Amino acid sequence: MKKINAIILLSSLTSASVFAGAYVENREAYNLASDQGEVMLRVGYNFDMGAGIMLTNTYNFQREDELKHGYNEIEGWYPLFKPTDKLTIQPGGLINDKSIGSGGAVYLDVNYKFVPWFNLTVRNRYNHNNYSSTDLSGELDNNDTYEIGTYWNFKITDKFSYTFEPHYFMRVNDFNSSNGKDHHWEITNTFRYRINEHWLPYFELRWLDRNVEPYHREQNQIRIGTKYFF
């Protein structure tokens, strides 16, 4: 398939350098507060005009524990409106399924390419659970969140790129996050190195706010993964 240059708009919208065509991805994560790990397997396809779709499957594990299924997810996006060669508006959505129930999300990305080596995406997203949970008042309700995220994408060299990714979550109903508040932050630093047209390994350092129950620690997470483009 045709290779897409890393500095064009498609890379900014997905916050990673991509090629048109199919790819597979494997990622492992470890949370220092919960001592829990995650293995992710993903397949995806990027279209020439900027749309994309991906299927994700995850498994969780802890020390001396067996591997347990996390969730299945399908996500897609489409560049709906591009008023200039620098500005793109792109909606997207996903559905997921796990042992406790199903859910989904819809989002709208607005990306602006300031210079060839820097672009910014602002994302507004609503996350919905189809199942009910017990809220702070003892009632059953949907533990939904409204999320605002930004992706600060820097192209350092032809092979090396960096993304700063802060996300702010607000509970829609009467629930608290793991920090004991009705809101929390998740901040990700992603470092990518393109070996060649096929291999793209990456390394992520994440802060997932403080956990007050049961770990009483800052939630720091490490992720290591790689993508292979066909």
UniProtKB/Swiss-Prot annotation:
> Which terms under GO biological process does the entry name?
arabinose transmembrane transport; D-glucose import; galactose transmembrane transport; monoatomic ion transport; oligosaccharide transport
User: Quick one: where is this thing mainly located?
Assistant: membrane
| Pfam families referenced in this protein's UniProt entry, alphabetically | KdgM (PF06178)
Question: Which InterPro entries does UniProt cross-reference here?
Answer: Bact_OM_Channel_sf, Oligogalacturonate-sp_porin
Q: Where does it live in the cell? A: Cell outer membrane
In terms of superkingdom, the source organism counts as: Bacteria
Check the UniProt entry and state the signal peptide residues, or none.
1-20
What family, per the record? Belongs to the oligogalacturonate-specific porin KdgM (TC 1.B.35) family. OmpL subfamily.
Protein name as it appears in the record: Porin OmpL
Q: What is the lineage of its organism?
A: Bacteria, Pseudomonadati, Pseudomonadota, Gammaproteobacteria, Enterobacterales
